[in-house]
From Swiss-Prot:
Membrane-topology annotation of the record: Multi-pass membrane protein
Protein name in UniProt: UPF0756 membrane protein BBR47_12340
Chief place of localization: membrane
Organism, scientific name: Brevibacillus brevis (strain 47 / JCM 6285 / NBRC 100599)
GO cellular component: plasma membrane
Source species taxonomy: Bacteria, Bacillati, Bacillota, Bacilli, Bacillales
Amino acid sequence: MLHTTIILLVIALLSLVAKDLVLVYASLLLLGLSLLKAVPVMDAIQKPMFHVGLFCLMVFLLIPIAKGKYDFISLGKEMVSWKATIAILAGFIISYVGGKGLSILPDQPVVFIGVTIGTLLAVLLSNGLPAGLIIAAGCIALLSRIFNF
């Protein structure tokens, strides 16, 4: 229990320094649940929270369409460009890699802690965006298969 408390506090503090308030709040929420020994609650919310996060991201990304920023004609013209082709390919590859990352994260906490620290350092040192945890874990999963580590 003490180890869990320390780890979550360190993540919260590093996140606060990096100004990643989402991770601060998540760490503190889970710290509270951990201190309350609310393991059944954490088990119950783990899978749905991933889907809630994806839902919020999709809403954010679809708002310009809902506001009428794009129409069929402009989208049709854009979709036959090289940029669109590369974007589709990139989306496919990143989604594939992300799927591999999602499968490795629950079973290997060292990967999560490592990519979290790397993400926080990127935010602190280079104005990075804390958006690549699952993709980074996917890269680790693929590399570990290739190099057997």
